[in-house]
Amino acid sequence: MYSPLCLTQDEFHPFIEALLPHVRAFAYTWFNLQARKRKYFKKHEKRMSKEEERAVKDELLSEKPEVKQKWASRLLAKLRKDIRPEFREDFVLTVTGKKPPCCVLSNPDQKGKMRRIDCLRQADKVWRLDLVMVILFKGIPLESTDGERLVKSPQCSNPGLCVQPHHIGVSVKELDLYLAYFVHAADSSQSESPSQPSEADIKDQPENGHLGFQDSFVTSGVFSVTELVRVSQTPIAAGTGPNFSLSDLESSSYYSMSPGAMRRSLPSTSSTSSTKRIKSVEDEMDSPGEEPFYTSQGRSPGSGSQSSGWHEVEPGYLRNPEHRGALHGMPSPTALKKSEKSGFSSPSPSQTSSLGTAFTQHHRPVITGPRASPHATPSTLHFPTSPIIQQPGPYFSHPAIRYHPQETLKEFVQLVCPDAGQQAGQVGFLNPNGSSQGKVHNPFLPTPMLPPPPPPPMARPVPLPVPDTKPPTTSTEGGATSPTSPTYSTPSTSPANRFVSVGPRDPSFVNIPQQTQSWYLG
């Protein structure tokens, strides 16, 4: 942004970055010219001549932009300390034009009045803060004794301590208006035709050795009217100034982050550091239509979207249930409600057969393993703060499925729907013979949220492997063949005892808790 050789670390404060393009280059020339004249008077005990003063003026005007910016940045840092902390944000926003002008109060001196500061590290000359603000941001050539000529606008609520440049004006007296007319007339006549005298000059010719009326006005300064107006309107950061513009300042601001986080070290202050930071901020935006990185309400961008999940990336898109189902590769809530009305009272693990297939089809290109770092294209999903899978978390956060990182999706699908989804996974439904089956506990599926079941004609008993070698028995009441372990009840027993104990599956395939599974016989 600046040359590292001319600025120190304290002069990279974003407060200075935002205000520096609005400082007039005339302020550097004016403050230094007054100091040179005062120093010359102390040394020689006489005032500087016109030729010497004009030479100093030309020297100051032709000074390098880096020197002017270094001086302005130091002065802005001093002004920042004199402005109350609660008004610093309003000061930047009003000067840069992002907010209507409001009062900006400064820290008072010991008597409760406007504080005075030295602008050139000189203790022998101090300036009122409101005078400094007018010279810096308006380019008005005021003396240090012109504090009484300043007037505050009627909108100012605290005229004694307000340093808002838009609330400070200069009172113009009758003498000023009178002198301005003749100075402007003389300047315009010289610019028209210096060789030919005008009618006013002919009428005001000295008679009998007496001076004319206009000759009684002596111009003490070395600036002409046109030159003064021209140099007072030139910003200090123009030309070869900082490599940032006002449009860049819209997206990077000091108030979006803490000052400690925004403070940069000296080696990183290259000319491209600001543009790199601005590009990285703009890359984190979802779309150009979003709200800007910095708003006038002082909203911090870091306060939002920190705890939002990846399914909240596109609220307008996910507000439609059909779109939400298409995004996740899962049936929408409306489809779930419709399937729940088909006559089945309780869900079962077999309902995840279609769900697991859709889940693997849609998410397998993204999720490659428990320690992988998924990345999605900006056209589909965009995650400004956190990746899809939190690295220290044991589960993949999903509204319907919990996926343990120790198992792959392929094994998960085989567990839920073995052999095309027509075997042991389909339990818990009424079979065509009227017998019902118990639920098989699955540690990978939470009970409250399960997908819809397949059609009931597809459900039928399937033989399950058991460690016991006893032959399977046949129930006498239901007419259906019991495919698994020996029975411990008779048809004449009570209904509470008409169950067949089922042993656990192969422990290498799935880890089922030690509670016994039972089938209802009858």
UniProtKB/Swiss-Prot annotation:
Belongs to the CTF/NF-I family. It holds the Pfam family MH1. Keywords: Activator, DNA replication, DNA-binding, Nucleus, Transcription, Transcription regulation. Recognizes and binds the palindromic sequence 5'-TTGGCNNNNNGCCAA-3' present in viral and cellular promoters and in the origin of replication of adenovirus type 2. These proteins are individually capable of activating transcription and replication. One of its GO terms (cellular component) is nucleus. Residues 376-389, 511-522 have a biased composition (Polar residues). Residues 189-199, 296-309, 342-354, 481-495 have a biased composition (Low complexity). Its main location: nucleus. This is Nuclear factor 1 A-type. It is found in: Nucleus. The 9aaTAD motif is a transactivation domain present in a large number of yeast and animal transcription factors. GO terms for molecular function: DNA-binding transcription factor activity, RNA polymerase II-specific; RNA polymerase II cis-regulatory region sequence-specific DNA binding. A motif (9aaTAD) lies at residues 407-415. Residues 189-211, 259-392, 451-522 are annotated as: Disordered. One of its GO terms (biological process) is regulation of transcription by RNA polymerase II. Residues 451-470 have a biased composition (Pro residues). Binds DNA as a homodimer. Residues 1-194 bind DNA.
